[in-house]
């Protein structure tokens, strides 16, 4: 990694003008297009005009932060004048060079410059693999402000106000047998995950439905916490972690 350069020289923010040519950090392809990346690119094209921010290391590496105004964030969280962090991820060569801190600080600086009341993100009592590192967030002052089952809404308030989970998100039950997955296109990994899970469930006679969350309104009314994926088994909410076939098989064997 380059040393001694200014942060704004190392980070790049996606815009409608550069979205088509910039890589999306967590899945980087040089020749063939990845369907999940292209689905996310289309999704981002609709979100950027709403104030959605995707900021990344200006290199072919995985180091980025993604956040949006809470009012237009596709999550069942309510509040005024907050930013919501979907993802903060650094891996591979950039790890250990302070880019996670730089990315987080860029978000917090952005929030203050825009006069926001604070910044929030989804966490859990036990760290989930597909959520941003909440211990890292705690170093900046993020703390739990609401709870839904084992999940927590973490917030850093600048003015003493706080967001909350939507009432529906605390329900965490639905009337459906087998596997139910709610998903959107925010994460590039989801496209292939859904395709493979559909095939697995069909091939193993597992009742399953996959519900594409395709609007802000639908996301705000979901019956569980959600960042970009939520799984139920026999009507009971399980996790925001993306599942594979063997994980579903274990659920059936319970």
Task: Give the location of each predicted region.
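Conserved GNAT acetyl-CoA-binding A-motif
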Residues: 111-129
């Amino acid at each position: 990694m380059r040393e001694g350069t200014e942060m704004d020289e190392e980070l790049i923010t996606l815009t409608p003008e550069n979205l088509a040519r910039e890589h999306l950090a967590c899945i980087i392809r040089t020749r063939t297009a990845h369907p999940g990346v292209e689905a996310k690119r289309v999704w981002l094209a609709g979100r950027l005009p709403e104030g959605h921010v995707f900021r990344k290391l200006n290199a072919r590496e995985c180091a980025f932060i993604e956040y949006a105004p809470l009012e237009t964030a596709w999550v069942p969280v309510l509040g005024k004048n907050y930013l919501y962090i979907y993802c903060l991820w650094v891996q591979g060569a950039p790890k250990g060079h302070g880019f996670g801190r730089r990315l987080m600080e860029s978000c917090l600086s952005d929030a203050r410059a825009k006069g926001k009341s604070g910044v929030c993100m989804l966490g859990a009592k036990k760290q989930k693999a597909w959520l941003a590192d909440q211990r890292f967030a705690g170093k900046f002052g993020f703390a739990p402000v609401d709870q839904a089952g084992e999940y927590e809404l973490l917030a850093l308030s600048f003015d003493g106000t706080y967001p909350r989970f939507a009432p529906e998100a605390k329900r965490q039950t639905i009337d459906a047998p087998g596997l139910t997955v709610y998903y959107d296109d925010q994460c590039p990994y989801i496209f292939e995950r859904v395709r493979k899970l559909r095939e697995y469930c069909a091939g193993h006679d597992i009742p399953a439905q996959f519900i594409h969350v395709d609007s802000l309104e639908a996301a705000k009314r979901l019956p569980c916490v959600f960042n970009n994926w939520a799984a139920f088994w026999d009507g009971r909410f399980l996790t925001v972690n993306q599942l594979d076939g063997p994980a579903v098989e274990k659920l059936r064997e319970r």
